[in-house]
Amino acid sequence: MNLIEIETYLANASFALLLITMLIYGMKAIFTKNNILQLFGTLGILFSNFLVALLLSIRWFDSHHFPLSNMYESLMFLCWCFTFFHLLIEKYIQINFIGFITVPIAMLVNAFATFFLPLDMQHSTPLVPALKSNWLIMHVTIMMASYAALILGSLLSIAFLFLTYNKQIELQGNSIGNINDEMNSYITIDIEFQKNESIELAKLIDNLSYRTIGIGFPLLTIGIISGAVWANDAWGSYWSWDPKETWALITWIIFAIYLHTRITKGWQGRRPAIVAFIGFVIVWVCYLGVNLLGQGLHSYGWFTK
């Protein structure tokens, strides 16, 4: 068995584990007090994380460069980031429902990379000259981690919008504080919804969304700055309005607006969630859309023909 076959096995195994884990979290939604299901779900995420990390490590060993030089590698790294953030949230914040957000998106990203990308795009290729730099590790890893955090935070906001759909609900209070504190007060005209435990879940989702985006935004900022420094080193210009640079700036502006409305204006609930939903679309355009067009300085190394 050669390294390519091992990589294929690891990719398929990680996808299968994520699929099984998603089913486990679905069962957990029915049997809410079953701790065994929760344990199996966490183990599924943990082993999936390990398998993807092993896959990327093998590619690193085989290619002699950090495995973030094409679309397949970046997608698998994004999948790893989703599972990594899941484990962090479960460990330090102890929010079990996060699996309903992280597992499906990690599985879909894994599936797209493993089953939909052409085989020639999955194989590791030599680095183009501009990518032969130590900036590759810092810039690309930070950008991918920021994408993962922003996507997860935006998905939580979308979940909040679904949960509060057709409900007259308003959140009041300060966004800053401990996520486990009862620091927000909720005003709702819908009495049945007020009696439902969903209001507490909505409260938690809104707060967690804010904090996750609060992690992704500084990472995105650092990623853009490091990319500008790398661009100056490689091409002699800090900023050239390349499509990827332009959409990264748009992404930064959208989430800056989100954080500004929450921190300065005191917005909570539906209005910032709508901004985050817009940000969710923009992130995917920045990450996948620009590369699918195959134009600009960032198109090489992702889609080769």
UniProtKB/Swiss-Prot annotation:
Q: List each coiled-coil range.
A: none
Q: Which biological process annotations from GO are given for this protein?
A: cytochrome complex assembly
This entry carries the following GO cellular component terms, namely:
chloroplast thylakoid membrane; plasma membrane
Q: Name one GO molecular function term.
A: heme binding
Q: Could you list the residue ranges that cross the membrane? A: 11-31, 36-56, 75-95, 97-117, 142-162, 212-232, 239-259, 273-293
Keyword DNA damage assigned: no
Main localization, broad class: plastid
Keyword list (alphabetical) reads: Chloroplast, Cytochrome c-type biogenesis, Membrane, Plastid, Thylakoid, Transmembrane, Transmembrane helix
Disulfide bridge positions per record: none
Note the superkingdom of the native organism. Eukaryota
The way it spans or sits in the membrane comes to: Multi-pass membrane protein
- InterPro entries recorded: Cyt_c_assembly, Cyt_c_biogenesis_CcsA, Cyt_c_biogenesis_CcsA/CcmC
Q: Which Pfam families match?
A: Cytochrom_C_asm
Cellular compartment(s): Plastid, Chloroplast thylakoid membrane
What is this protein for, i.e. what is its function? Required during biogenesis of c-type cytochromes (cytochrome c6 and cytochrome f) at the step of heme attachment.
Q: Which family does it belong to?
A: Belongs to the CcmF/CycK/Ccl1/NrfE/CcsA family.
Subunit structure, interactors included: May interact with Ccs1.
Q: What is this protein called?
A: Cytochrome c biogenesis protein CcsA
The UniProt gene name for this protein comes to: ccsA
